[in-house]
Amino acid sequence: MNGNKSLYPIWLGVLGVALLAGLVAGAFIFMHGHVLFNANDVLIWTLPLGVYIFLALASSGLTLLSALPLVFGIKKFEPVAKRLVFLAIATLCGGFVSIGLELGSIFHMIYILLSPNLSSPIWWMGAIYSVELVVLAVKFWKMHTGDYHSSFSKFLGTASFALALVAPLMIGSVFGLTESRATYFGPLMSIYCLLMALLSGTALFILYSMVVERVSGSGSAGEHHAVIDDFCRIFTYATGIVMVFTILRFIMESATTIPAFLAYHQFAHSFGAWHGFHFEVVLGLFLPFVLMLVPSVRQSTGGKVVTSSLILLGTLAMHMEILLAGQSHPVGPKAEQFPQYVQYVPSLWEWLVLVFALAVMLLLYTLGERYLKLNEAPTG
């Protein structure tokens, strides 16, 4: 982001304030634990876990997009391959910041590493994403040194693609295998997470590309413009597919008489749902899809920024809606001391975890764009 040097120190200052606030929040969370979160015996997964899911899936989506040139050999996408890999790394780092603070203690992170549970989808989720981060880092280093086409570099590209396919499926299985929670259970959750990964990753790359183009003051070259247009097509298709899955999910939920779903229809949360009406789906999924069908919106920089921003906000809210709805209806002995469904509003500390994770991610974006020559394309 070299084009507008006067804004660069201001931007770094904003990130510095956000990082400082996040570090203070992290210190308090590690000292006092989950008592700082608005969690309870029923609702134990809150905003920090939702942020982790959102960023981890977006990272997987970016990795899947990078496979177009690196695995499938589509050369027109090679100029953006290095940037895609780096964005995947930075986004996943932000996700790890959020999940690290969600655990409430740094000793919990060490304990997970030292006591693997091979029968736990949650452990496999963390293990796969940890391996994916290492593979992506090595792949980026190989690309940074100009090695795109050696056998080892191609192996890393294929491995990262495979991990990016499996990781969202594993996140979905964390919820889909939970038989005691009807709103989680089912095989479609893994497929839904994979589609959401592709959608949010594509939206993030389009938004980032438009911002970099604007800040750097460089207009899109013909080839780069064509690549962004192709990503916009992928973005539109992914939005449409996720929209169909979402509609089918609503239809199935509305036809059931399972108590958990009946309570779910009355559930309201601070991320867009109110008495069964999901504003986050309408504004964060349906509206962007309609806008992307309009050629003038789809081809304009402002249209790309607005639609991709709406999708990112919408997908985060949709992740939170699914996460909270599955816990909102107390079951077993807990049903005797709690209301029919439990409400949730994030605490200040949870919002600071979100700020910290995004600040780490954006700082890595900024430094990478400035010093790591992310617009390099392979030669030969």
Language-model features, listed with the residues they occupy:
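Membrane helical hairpin/interfacial module
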Residues: 43-107, 122-124, 128
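Peri-membrane helix termini and adjoining interfacial loops of integral membrane proteins
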Residues: 31-36, 107-110, 254-262, 328-336
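Alpha-helical transmembrane segments of multi-pass membrane proteins
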Residues: 14-34, 97-103, 166-175, 365
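TerminUS-proximal long segments
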Residues: 302-380
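N-terminal regions that are enriched for targeting/export leaders
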Residues: 1-48
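Long, contiguous internal "core" modules enriched in hydrophobic/ aromatic residues
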Residues: 2, 8, 14-21, 76, ...
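Juxtamembrane/interface segments at transmembrane-helix termini
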Residues: 28-37, 41, 69-77, 81, ...
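Membrane-interface transmembrane-helix boundary segments in multi-pass integral membrane proteins
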Residues: 28-30, 49-52, 123, 189-193, ...
